[in-house]
Amino acid sequence: RPWEIGVLATVGRARVRTHRRPRVAILVNGDELVSLEDFDEVLAGRRIVDSNSHALAAAVRAAGCEPRLLGIARDDEGSIRERLSAGLECDAIVTVAGASVGEHDLVKRALAGMGFRLDFWRVRMKPGNPFSFGHLDGVPVFGLPGNPVSAGVTFEVLVHPALRLMLGRSAVHSPTIGVATGETLEPLADRVQFLRVRLEKEARGTFTARRTGPQGSGILSSLARADALLVVPAGDEPIPAGTRLAAIPLPAPDEGQASSGF
């Protein structure tokens, strides 16, 4: 922080040990995806634009790390292995899609063929259940679901804390604040939900969380409009409006960075 640098100058420290910004490789997978340069394919209804690369690169920068885009790997194990090999030069790899069970989920097979060690797969959370984590040649690999909201939520809840650890931060877990629910909520019996919400400040200084709209895992606007994730614990009974729950504030726009990173 600026004033810490001032303190160092005050005590005559011209050089200090620091943590290098981790380099994070990002790989997306899918024959249906195209880059922004080929947006005409999207307009023609033949393809889907790759939004995850841009969103995750911005999230990695906001976390204080350096993103490296590995591009779009096609549904071919050779293509996936080639791009993953390039990512081994980085400090961490984030893959998007190919983390769930399905005939087109080739990332796991490609990783297995390269000697990947899977530490765990599946987390009892929604969205983001098919998240995976392991190591490839000593490099941590985070496997995110392909749906944009699932990818964004798992990054904030599971990947961001790991990046804080790599940066040498003492506080690695995402901070939470207590908020009141703005409506009755229906919890899931077997997993924690992370609802995208806006926090409204009340006259008495407390906050009320209200959903940003439909919460489908493909509705990226629900995350774009949110300033927090409301943590809804698993349970069998409805949660009445006004109940106090924890919320994870999402990173605010950086005043010093006007560029979107495109």
Predicted regions located by residue number:
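Short, glycine/charged-enriched hinge/interface segments at domain edges or termini
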Residues: 1-69, 213-214, 249-251, 262
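A generic local secondary-structure boundary/capping motif
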Residues: 10-18, 45-47, 84, 121, ...
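Residue-level signal for inorganic ion chemistry
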Residues: 26, 60, 94, 197, ...
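Hydrophobic/aromatic beta-strand patches that form the interior of the parallel beta-sheet core
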Residues: 27, 68-71, 140-142, 177
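Short glycine-rich anion-binding loops that position phosphate/pyrophosphate groups of nucleotides
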Residues: 31-32, 98-101, 146
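A general structural motif
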Residues: 47-53, 73-78, 121-130
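N-terminal small/polar loop signature for handling phosphorylated ligands or for N-terminal nucleophile
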Residues: 54-115
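Flexible glycine/proline-rich
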Residues: 110-262
